[in-house]
Design a protein with these regions (language model features):
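Alpha4 helix (beta4-alpha4-beta5 surface) of REC/receiver domains from two-component response regulators
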Residues: 74, 78-81, 86-113, 119, ...
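Receiver (REC) domain active-site loop signature in two-component systems and cognate sites
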Residues: 67
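Charged docking surfaces used in two-component/phosphorelay signaling
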Residues: 25-33
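CheY-like receiver
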Residues: 133-145
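Active-site residues of response regulator receiver
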Residues: 64
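Short hydrophobic/Thr-rich beta-strand motif most characteristic of the beta2 strand and flanking loop
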Residues: 35-42, 50, 112
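Acidic catalytic/metal-coordinating carboxylates
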Residues: 42-46, 71-75
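Conserved sequence signature across two-component system core domains
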Residues: 17-18, 41, 61
Length: 145
C-alpha cells in the first residue's frame, strides 16, 4: 500500500484590474475555471491598496491598459516597485491605440487583445506565469520614463 501523497502546488493568485465590471466578472470566471485564485480591482487605486498588503500573495497582475484613473503600464510600474517578482499581463480592447502600441507592444510586453476566449486567456496566463522574471518587463517600463 502506497502511503505517499503527492504534494499539489498551491494555486496561483491573479490580481485582475479593469474599470469595467462585466470584464472583471467574465475574466474571474475564466480564471477560476483554470483553478486560479482571483482578486478583483475596479481601479488602479484599489489595485495599489491590494498590492500594498504584504499579507496577500499575488503571482500575476492582469491589467487593462486603458483605464480612467491610471494607465495599466503606469500601474504595473508602481506595483512592481512593491513586488519586483510579480509577472504582468496586459489586456485591452484597443490594440490599435497609441497607448497600447507605444507602452506595451513596442516593448514586447505580454499582451492579450480583447475579446479573448477562455482557452486563449488560460494559455496566455500559463505562458506568462512560466516565463522568466519580470526584470525585462521592468526594464521595458523604465525605458518609457
Amino acid at each position: 500500500m502506497d502511503t505517499t501523497t503527492e504534494l499539489q502546488p498551491h494555486p496561483k493568485t491573479i490580481l485582475v484590474v479593469d474599470d469595467e465590471l462585466s470584464v472583471l466578472t467574465v475574466v474571474k470566471c475564466m480564471l477560476e475555471s483554470g483553478d486560479y485564485n482571483v482578486m478583483l480591482a475596479n481601479s488602479a487605486a484599489a489595485a495599489l491598496r491590494i498590492a500594498g498588503n504584504n499579507e496577500v500573495t499575488i503571482d500575476l497582475l492582469l491589467t487593462d491598459v486603458i483605464m480612467p484613473d491610471m494607465q495599466g503600464p503606469d500601474l504595473a510600474e508602481r506595483i512592481l516597485a512593491l513586488r519586483p517578482e510579480l509577472k504582468v499581463l496586459f489586456i485591452s480592447g484597443y490594440a490599435d491605440s497609441d497607448v497600447v502600441r507605444i507602452k506595451v507592444l513596442n516593448h514586447n510586453l505580454s499582451f492579450l487583445p480583447k475579446p479573448f476566449t477562455p482557452d486563449g486567456l488560460l494559455e496566455t496566463v500559463e505562458r506568462v506565469l512560466n516565463a522568466p522574471s519580470s526584470r525585462a518587463f521592468a526594464a521595458g517600463l523604465n525605458a518609457l520614463s
